[in-house]
């Protein structure tokens, strides 16, 4: 069950493309705490963390480390919103779908697959820049958690994905 708090959530991998440093800027701009849950094992990830994230950690900006499934679900349930400030053409952002499945609002940068996965103003807020993402934080109460879950189930459930693959294979076979 969803019990949102005040904190925003960044969930991903420690890299400039994923943008934990941008999530920090958003959290600071709107005056909200931020939990950062991210994989940070590779040399590049560690270097990025040490240079761009670690200097900003305090009682409001917290790095919780890499998390397992149960911890991820708990963080999503407790988050005010998931922020996805990507700076690359993300081919498929599973974390956005996981958030929707939990009924957690998503605020994402309009890059890659984001506009295909998220429906701006209905299931999420999609922005063109960090200012737009920050402005969307105040609007997440407009999104209905039940509708977010229903959308995730209707579009991305295992049955839906399997049926989509079958249809694609049948179309290829039929030429």
Identify the function of each model-found stretch:
Residues 1-37:
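Conserved donor-binding/catalytic core segment of Leloir-type glycosyltransferases
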Residues 110-121, 125-127:
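Short acidic/histidine- and often glycine-rich active-site loop of Leloir-type glycosyltransferases
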Residues 139-158, 164:
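A short, well-ordered alpha-helix in the C-terminal region of glycosyltransferases
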Residues 93-96, 114:
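Short glycine/serine-rich donor-binding loops of glycosyltransferases
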Residues 125-147:
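C-terminal "capping" alpha-helix adjacent to the active site of nucleotide-linked donor transferases
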Residues 101, 105-108:
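Short hydrophobic beta-strand element within catalytic cores of glycosyltransferases
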Residues 8, 77-91, 104:
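Acidic donor-binding loop of glycosyltransferase active sites
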Residues 36-38, 50-73:
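Nucleotide-activated donor-binding/catalytic signature segment of Leloir-type glycosyltransferases, i.e.
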